[in-house]
Amino acid sequence: MGSGEEPSQMRRALVDSLAGAISGGISRTVTSPLDVIKIRFQVQLEPTTSWGILRRDVYGPSKYTGLLQATKDILREEGLPGFWRGNVPALFMYMPYTAIQFTVLHKLKTFASGSSRTEDHLDLSPYLSYVSGAIAGCTATIGSYPFDLLRTILASQGEPKVYPNMRSAFIDIIKTRGVQGLYSGLSPTLVEIIPYAGLQFGSYDTFKRSMMTWNRYKYSHLSFGSEDDSVSSFQLFLCGFAAGTFSKAACHPLDVVKKRFQIEGLKRHPRYGAPIESSTYKGMYHALKEIVVKEGFGGLYKGLFPSLVKSAPAGAVTFVVYEYISDWIGCKAGVE
């Protein structure tokens, strides 16, 4: 590699990091209320529906039985700030997470395609997009995981608070479980993130490629032979929306298991239902089996609706903001 290429590649990496961090921060803050509700559903052992046919009264009465009911409950008991519970560690997680993810993704695609131009990356095999997304997701997860753990704990604790802030939760985990405690649940998280990130980025590239093909066809037939394939912001939004929905729906059971591992041993108020004691689950397979046996198959999909309502626009916002911020900063910095 020539010395002249190194500054350009460094600028490209900085552009990807900054664009990824900004898009992740905006997406996370906008969708925080739905994320809090989703987490409350996922860590509730009791049924999350009032439909009798789906109920399995193994643990007792349910705290949350629907999106609207949960919204009213959180608003009444915790006020508006309750919907942004855990948002600070979430930002500390999402901003470096998306920064690392998009940077690694661009590096991998540049290596595979032999070009740093984003347009050339769309010519890659869809399988390479999936693999690149999975590797980028794993790298980003390892780099930001402690904040993911703190976010889940703070978002799920309710009132009265077990931990008043992120600092107190961090110190308590270090004291009681050591540094390794900050990585509780990392293994199931990596098992989840590999298919999730792969599907998210792979499907986004696939949808975007299809949209460009449609644009070429449309303009060549309707616009006097023009073959403009540029993708509009609304089309980018649709691609991100579809990618977020598809990837989250496919991997939701693994996300439920991940959340259960993350809050093992958390002493919440009894009104939030049966606690998840330490060592309740001996591994991912055991957790999946226990959830199905005690909560039914529906237990693996607790929080799916708020998760989809959140993930679809979150994915759309992330990709649209990233594309625009990346292009804008890239133009200012003279980076292709």
Swiss-Prot record:
InterPro entries: Mit_carrier, Mitochondrial_sb/sol_carrier, Mt_carrier_dom_sf. Pfam families: Mito_carr. Mitochondrial transporter that mediates uptake of thiamine diphosphate (ThDP) into mitochondria. Keywords: Membrane, Mitochondrion, Mitochondrion inner membrane, Repeat, Transmembrane, Transmembrane helix, Transport. It is a multi-pass membrane protein. The chain crosses the membrane at residues 11-27, 88-105, 127-150, 182-199, 230-246, 303-322. It is found in: Mitochondrion inner membrane. Solcar repeats lie at residues 11-111, 124-210, 231-328. This is Mitochondrial thiamine diphosphate carrier 1. Belongs to the mitochondrial carrier (TC 2.A.29) family. It comes from Zea mays (Maize). Ubiquitous with highest expression in pollen. GO terms for biological process: thiamine pyrophosphate transmembrane transport. One of its GO terms (molecular function) is thiamine pyrophosphate transmembrane transporter activity. One of its GO terms (cellular component) is mitochondrial inner membrane.
